[in-house]
Regions:
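Short juxtamembrane and helix-loop transition motifs at transmembrane-helix boundaries
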Residues: 34-43, 65-73
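Membrane-water interface at the C-terminal end of transmembrane alpha helices
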Residues: 112-129
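Cytosolic juxtamembrane helix and N-cap/initiation of the first transmembrane helix
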Residues: 1-18
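Core segments of alpha-helical transmembrane spans in multipass integral membrane proteins
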Residues: 21-23, 40-64, 80-83
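Non-cytosolic membrane-interface motifs at loop->transmembrane helix junctions
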Residues: 35-42, 98-110
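Alpha-helical transmembrane segments of multi-pass membrane proteins
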Residues: 16-29
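Hydrophobic alpha-helical membrane segments
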Residues: 52-58, 75-93, 112-114
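Membrane-helix boundary connector in multi-pass membrane proteins
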Residues: 68, 89-105, 124-125
Length: 129
């Protein structure tokens, strides 16, 4: 498998992994169900995971629909959603001190390289001269 099909599969795998791992990791007694967390913090934890799942679902739908069909606007939206979501992992510790930790940076760093490769593989290409 080469080119666009490989990129579609790669973006699907990354998106599915990000969505599922967020639910598995955050819906635990150490995070959203942590009794030490105030209810408002638990609510924001839930919102963060819900947004991640929806963004990753949108990436998959865009990839296999309009991006696969070669529509440039869809590729731009896909790039904005996926790279924007990844950027949040690196920007959050700067904006909210004390929120950065090595596992979060590693999670984002590990997903960034294959995301860039997938985005490049599904990029719109000019046809003809």
């Amino acid at each position: 498998m080469t080119g666009k099909p490989a990129g579609l599969v790669l973006l699907t795998a990354i998106s599915a992994f990000a969505a599922v791992s967020g639910v598995v990791y955050d819906f635990t007694p150490t995070h959203i169900f942590n009794p030490a967390w105030p209810p408002h913090a638990q609510f924001h934890g839930y919102l963060s995971i819900a947004r991640t799942v929806l963004i990753m679902l949108a990436v998959i739908v865009l990839a296999w629909g309009p991006v696969r069909a070669g529509l440039p606007y869809a590729w731009g939206v896909l790039v904005l959603l996926l790279l924007g979501w990844l950027a949040i992992w690196f920007v959050a510790p700067v904006v909210v001190s004390g929120t950065g930790d090595l596992p979060a940076y590693l999670f984002a760093a590990v997903l960034t390289a294959p995301a860039l490769v997938g985005i490049w593989l599904v990029r719109p290409r000019r046809t003809g001269a």
